[in-house]
Regions:
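A short, polar/proline- and glycine-enriched secondary-structure boundary/capping micro-motif
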Residues: 107-112, 158-160
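Hydrophobic membrane-insertion alpha-helices, especially the h-region
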Residues: 7-25
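Short, surface-exposed beta-strand/loop "edge" segments at domain boundaries and coil↔beta transitions
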Residues: 93-110, 143-147, 170-171, 178-181
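Extracytoplasmic low-complexity, Pro/Thr/Ser/Ala/Gly-rich segments
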Residues: 25-104, 181, 186
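Ser/Thr-rich low-complexity repeats and stalk/linker segments
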Residues: 145-186
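Extracellular ectodomain segments of secreted/surface proteins
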Residues: 111-140
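Terminal targeting segments of Actinobacterial cell-envelope proteins
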Residues: 1-4
């Protein structure tokens, strides 16, 4: 009986050690650089009329599934670049959403993630363009000062960046003291 307890305890310790090792390998460990505390100061500023999401965006099933409120309450316009508008929207269960609206193309899209993603990366979208390049837009936490791809650097403004004509498969976001790489996939 005593031998079984010892074996069980050893097996339990081995399982815990294996789980810890796998979580570090799969989820990342100390190699994940943190920039800032994950806060988004753009969401704390006073709301104005331009911060309201278009009705067409609120009508999407995506909005009902992901936004914290059905009318997108708390949304903030982060960037306006030509006909492209980027919004941050509080999401359900601690999520935060990035919404991209292109008035000229008549399109809108969105991505949501847990706010903790902003500690080690970005909530982003990488849209394929007609020329094969990507339009990469992202929402980052406070502390990020730039986004870069292929030796082209753009400033982060109001917690957002816009990188046009990205041909590679990664984008770098950073601050004067730290850098993070975002893999865009295929």
């Amino acid at each position: 009986m005593k031998r079984r307890r010892v074996h069980f305890a050893a097996l339990l310790i081995l399982a815990a050690t294996t789980a810890g090792l796998l979580s570090q390998l799969v989820l990342g460990g100390s190699d994940r650089v943190r920039i800032g505390n994950g806060s988004v100061s753009a969401l704390t500023r006073s709301s104005t009329a331009v911060d309201s999401l278009p009705d067409s965006v609120l009508a999407y099933p995506f909005a009902a599934r992901n936004f914290a409120s059905k009318n997108g309450e708390g949304s903030r316009l982060l960037r306006l670049t030509g006909t492209l508008r980027l919004y941050a929207v509080p999401g359900k269960e601690g999520m935060l959403c990035l919404i991209e609206v292109d008035d000229a193309a008549g399109t809108a899209g969105g991505a949501c993630a847990d706010r903790h993603v902003l500690l080690t990366g970005s909530i982003y979208m990488a849209d394929r363009q007609e020329d094969g390049s990507r339009l990469v837009v992202g929402l980052v936490g406070d502390g990020h000062t730039y986004a870069e791809a292929e030796d082209r650097r753009v400033p982060v403004q109001s917690n957002a960046f816009v990188l046009r004509g990205v041909d590679g498969s990664s984008v770098t976001v950073g601050s004067p003291t730290a850098v993070q790489t975002i893999d865009l996939g295929d």
